[in-house]
Amino acid sequence: MLIGQVSRLSAIPPLALQHTLRPLHSSSVLAAGGKRPKQSPSHSRNSPRQKPDWEKRGSNRGRSEQPRASRFGLKSSGTTSFRSEPPRARRVISDSSSGSSASITPKGQHVPTSSRRLLPFSSSDTIPKPSHRFKLEPATMPPNLTPRSFNRDDGVTEEYINGLPAYPTPPTTLANEEQARPRTFDDFGLEEGLVKSLKGLYGEDGKTTPIETLSFHHFTQPDIASAPIGSQRVLLGAETGSGKTVSYLIPLFHHLKRTDPGPSVTSSFFADSENTLHPRSIILSPTHELTRQSTQFAKILTHNTKLSVHGMSSTVSGGVGEKRGSVDVLLGTVGSLRRMFGMTRSEEEQEKEDYIRGKRIWQDEQEKGMVEGDKVEWVVIDEADVLLGREFYLDTISVLSQVKQANLILCTATLPPFLINLLTTNPFFTKKEPFIHLLSPGLHKLPPKLLTRFIRPSTTGNKHGDVAHQVRLTLAEDAKAAKAEGREGEEPSKIVIFCNSDKQVEQVSGILGTKKIDCLAWTGAGEERLRGRNGSLNDFLQRPHLPGHEPPAPLPSLEPRETKPIFQDKNGTTPNVSQVTRRRVLVTTSLLSRGLDFHPSVSSVFLVQPPRDVLDFVHRAGRAGRAGRPGRVVVFGIDEGGTLGEGAKNNKGGKGQGPLKKDGKTALGDRLKDVLGKREVVGAMGKRVRT
């Protein structure tokens, strides 16, 4: 057995099992349409105090109505009521090598929450420990209120290290290079059909990635194969573009095939098979786009094993379609599964996810429960830090509650402290064996061949103009490199631009249009987001296929039109670009930043606005440079020191070299430097300043 490959967390004390803990904060930046959840403006200091919220605990007040401060456990001193006001000044402890020093966080300045940062991987004796005891609230506490142990007036001192809360997080470790070394697909004793599919995709000499090695080795152990259903609880963590989807799909298919009851079990096996669907496994994803891509990839991997795969986001109705009886793998969003399990919402509680372009996804006859969880053996939660975060936690738990007993796999590219804490303190997850952690050595690192390019602002202050100029320069640079390397016949390079809101997407795409740069604007409520299919988005997504099975051609743009060349060489000609071209620039939000595998032609990712924190940065930047390919992330609004927002704006003269902020104003700071690889600073006109 591979020694040291996994780390088991200590069992929770029996007393803690008597209480309930909701997740503190969310690691989710995904709301409907890729928008961030709206928050009520903070009250002024002279505004009247609110009535105690303890009286409202039985109410069904929506999360969107909850004041920002109460979400984060901020309360005024001397009262038990939650109040929407900025936090008071707090002591911040610095663990610099020169010694510890204390500073005061200015009043009214929001300290980043502990869930919006990356888990530090240090030896257990150096992990910061809070000075206070971690207290769990009684089960009567409603899920929309924050545990009092993180309130400001509970009489407990809270420590901060480098401006971040010292979260009471159990330690965990990464696998080492030897444990995660590449191995051939034949080394693990996988089902023959799965090995054949893997070799068809990655070649006869193909080898595993680190997270695939860890996962395949663990799930093919003899004791795992014979373990009872419900005993397997695994957390898979690896950097973006490292094969996490394969790392959970292959073991899942391996065990489903080993326990396949055979062709004798048909739809007629179930008494109510004409009306319901009985999946053997469920895969949850945060978005319809990711669900569709995972469904397509799952069908490719099971081509030689003949397992049945059904994706709910691939149907026009958004449900199970005409599928009934038994199915091996069912993929869907949390909202889709809630519907199919019969957990409907009132009109006031209906999510925007239920609508696309103003039309309902669901057909009336599919609003009632059409899926039964009695036969589910495996549940996979993809992008677990999102689905177990604030915005999706209650819905995710409600779906899991419909499954009587199943093995559980969590998959994530970022591991915020709240997730580990949740899995080791929440009774929902501590009723059984502790989670086994399979963490890649490269977790919380950007892809090794991804170049980070910081763009200094121009003296004109026209950021959108700078973006358009950088788009032209980047595509020209890619065309020149392709010509030099003899790759002129390949698909032209593409760019994905991330914005923080739908409105910003509209603004950026409009400016690019005026600059004769045709682009695809993709938002939750966008005109090109279709029900049941990706449409023009397929131009930018990976299209895997087995030998002899060519991938479906991506759909052309809805309104193809002639476009002028967006760049020309010295002779005035446009290299490798036809007069009628597909769109090569995608402008979107965080809606597409989670889990999606973009086509190799996507060479660059642009971050037009500063990301909210390092988690956002890692996920957005990780859409390029995937699977060992070179790529670049072009960053606007952040200088090379990692300063965000106002810190970048305050740099006069377009220098972009302001001092690194360490006052807790943002969550990047030192953590940004930890995830970056190769980097360079470029002026607004494209001249390299330094590397």
UniProtKB/Swiss-Prot annotation:
Q: State the reactions this protein catalyses.
A: ATP + H2O = ADP + phosphate + H(+)
Where are the compositionally biased (Basic and acidic residues) regions? 50-68
Q: Where in the cell is it found?
A: Mitochondrion
What GO molecular functions are on record for this protein? ATP binding; ATP hydrolysis activity; RNA binding; RNA helicase activity
* Extent of the transit peptide: 1-31
SUPFAM superfamilies, alphabetized:
P-loop containing nucleoside triphosphate hydrolases
Task: Report the domain of life of the source organism.
Answer: Eukaryota
The record places the motif (DEAD box) at: 382-385
* EC class: hydrolase
PROSITE patterns tied to this protein: HELICASE_ATP_BIND_1, HELICASE_CTER, Q_MOTIF
Compositional bias, Polar residues, is annotated for 39-49, 111-126
Q: Which cysteines are cross-linked by disulfides?
A: none
Q: Which UniProt keywords apply?
A: ATP-binding, Helicase, Hydrolase, Mitochondrion, Nucleotide-binding, RNA-binding, Transit peptide
Q: What is its EC number?
A: 3.6.4.13
Q: Which GO terms fall under biological process for this protein?
A: ribosome biogenesis
Q: Has keyword Ligase?
A: no
Span of domain Helicase ATP-binding: 225-433
Q: Which residues form a coiled coil?
A: none
Output compositional bias ranges, type Low complexity: 94-103
What does the UniProt function comment say about this protein?
A: ATP-binding RNA helicase involved in mitochondrial RNA metabolism. Required for maintenance of mitochondrial DNA.
Q: Which family does it belong to?
A: Belongs to the DEAD box helicase family. MRH4 subfamily.
What does the entry's domain section say? The Q motif is unique to and characteristic of the DEAD box family of RNA helicases and controls ATP binding and hydrolysis.
Protein name listed in UniProt = ATP-dependent RNA helicase MRH4, mitochondrial
Q: Which organism is it from?
A: Cryptococcus neoformans var. neoformans serotype D (strain JEC21 / ATCC MYA-565) (Filobasidiella neoformans)
What high-level taxonomic lineage is stated for the organism? Eukaryota, Fungi, Dikarya, Basidiomycota, Agaricomycotina
Q: Which gene encodes it?
A: MRH4
